[in-house]
């Protein structure tokens, strides 16, 4: 395997760019190939089997580009497809749930941990199981936040509407007295200032995607597949199954890249199922 090959990142939409942003900062010599399945989001309400199917379609697309590692930059897809992808693919596959769970336990002082995520991730109990396996004494309070992803995907995440929706959604969770809150969806860091404002300064927010890049770095070193050139060999590539201009508008702002460009692609035929 050529060390100069890209790392593949995949998500249901633009949320995975929160992971990419950290990767660009932490691993500047690594080439990024990213695909966001905006045509079929949100993944949260979908059955796990369907999410697995979509995940394999994205993985196949990236594998055809000879990536050296796959990062499932989506909590719902990690919960539904990580074991199957690891079994089927010949390259390292990294999800976002285990790194986020470890970071939450490390940050929590009173072992009262909140998890906010999509319906699919909450339904899977993936975070609860990961946290309690490591520390059975922990208390885990989970809440699905189905309105958050649409706010981000419609580029409304800094709006007054977003502020109101976040406050209303987290009203009950705030009463649960958690000291640490896992942002269990890679879209949610774009709402981080609003979430922090509602939960208060005493609650530590855990960005599971950002924590995942630490795992990516460790695996690159362990397997000796990090790019050892002084610069990237190949340019980064970004793909969306949705509208490229909408994807670009969010990405340019979030990544701070005014010349950011994305390409539209089609995957499968189940966009409206």
Curated annotation (Swiss-Prot):
SUPFAM superfamilies: Aspartate/glutamate racemase. It comes from the Bacteria. One of its GO terms (molecular function) is glutamate racemase activity. The keyword Isomerase applies. Signal peptide: none annotated. One of its GO terms (biological process) is peptidoglycan biosynthetic process. Substrate binds at residues 11-12, 43-44, 75-76, 186-187. Pathway: Cell wall biogenesis; peptidoglycan biosynthesis. The active site is at residues 74, 185. It catalyses: L-glutamate = D-glutamate. Belongs to the aspartate/glutamate racemases family. Provides the (R)-glutamate required for cell wall biosynthesis. This is Glutamate racemase. The gene is murI.
